[in-house]
Amino acid sequence: MESSNQFLGTERISKLMQKYAIPCIISLLVGALYNIVDQIFIANASYLGSYGNAANTVVFPLTVVALAIAVMIGDGCCAFVSISLGQNEVPKAKRSVGNAVVMCLVSSIVLAALYLIFADNILAVFGGTVNAETYHHSQEYFFYITLGVPFYMFGQAMNPIIRADGNPRFAMISTLAGAVLNIILDPVFIFGLRWGMMGAAVATVIGQLVTAALAVWYLLHMKIIRPEKGDYRLKGSICGRTLTLGMTSFLSQISLVAAMAAINNRIRKYGALDTVFGQEQYAQIPMAVVGIVMKFFQIVISIVVGMAAGCIPIVGFNMGAKKPARVKELFTKLLLAEAAVGVVALVLVEGFPRQLIALFGAANESVYYTDFAVKSFRIYLCMIILACVNKACFIFLQAMGKAVESTALSMVREVVFGVGFALLLPRFFGLDGVLYSMPMSDILTFLIAGYLICKTYRELNQKGEV
């Protein structure tokens, strides 16, 4: 059993990063594509257009709630398993997996039920009432997406657990299979059968079902940490530790939902006061545009989180095995790689915003749509380099078992700064204030993250190699 995971403490760090991070990046990118591909096809369907895009933007935060719960369970279990294997405590690792499966199934069913019961109220909170057409499309899309919530959450929760079992490639393949099927079915349902928002949602749910089915198969054939029957009995200490380790992932996602709710509502309020977007036929444009900008940001963050999350098993094992020098080397290489991703993203948003917009059906829209979209890309994401480094810091601290620091930093970024600036700045700058909330949040968060990065280096230096 030891030989199956000891290479995490001996193999070159750069090679381990390639082995674990690349499949994780692909998995997260593909997972992000579920919603993004829907939005691209919706935007290019002339009978849906910006109304469909706005509806997608309304529903998107609600899928993030499901993702937040799933990654809290999955990432927490992944960190728990990796640390346990580093300490050669395989039975404890197996119990964590069994408990994670049960927690995921129960929470996904409860969440789907709540969504169905309170659908109208939920859509109103996230800005679905901007106009009648947007609300109609939001209702239709949300209903069918909700039916797939249990499949979506199980697939997303199992992904990091599969990586912790030493098989990042299968984790990637299972996600890729579902996403490819979604991409194939989207044009068939939206353009061929003209099912509209229902077609986009059904294609997504079918893809999620395939990913979940593959995850179930792998669960029954795990190499190292396959749970026994008794491991599915919930144990308070293991559930608590798993959820604590995954809390940063949860708060990172759920606080994004809070920020998006604030942003959507500010857009609805201050868009109505704008001379152009206050008109009924243009009211959905700001919400549709900000949704597109967020989708691009999601692609970038999927790469960033993929790099960092892919390193969780490596960090956890080497922390458990008391090899701080390797952890320090990994941290350095990760921060440099994340900053490089941010540089590339910045060049794209500042230099080629019109080309990015074109992917989402700008040819079918008015000049007001295009002009606001260009401005949104250039302002909202102007500090994306700092956003990438901040996100890497959150996840690395989580992987080291520093749940308090990681959780606090994530909460400050998304809730204190993210929601705070989204509510405050529009009072002074109107609709543009919504756009400035993102860079302001990233600048202030980076000041705190920089301190924690330096502190982490000092601690690793003091521990020395055992």
Tell where the protein language model's regions lie, with residue ranges.
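Short alpha-helical transmembrane segments in multi-pass integral membrane proteins
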Residues: M1-A21, V81-G148, G192-M247, V315-M383, ...
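Helix-terminus/linker motif at the lipid-water interface of multi-pass membrane proteins
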Residues: L29, L33-A54, L123-A132, V188-R194, ...
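Small-residue hotspots at the loop-to-helix junctions and early N-terminal turns
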Residues: S50-P61, S138, F142, A201, ...
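Residue-level hotspots within pore-lining transmembrane alpha-helices
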Residues: I26, V30, Y34-V37, A66-A70, ...
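Small-residue-rich hydrophobic transmembrane alpha-helices
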Residues: N53-A113, Y152-A171, M287-V347, G351-P353, ...
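Transmembrane helical elements of multi-pass membrane transporters/channels
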Residues: K19-D38, Y144, G178, G207-T211, ...
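Short runs within selected transmembrane alpha-helices of multi-pass transporters and secretion channels
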Residues: S27, Y144-R163, A171-A179, A200-A213, ...
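N-terminal transmembrane alpha-helices
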Residues: G9-L48, P61-G76, F80, L105-A112, ...
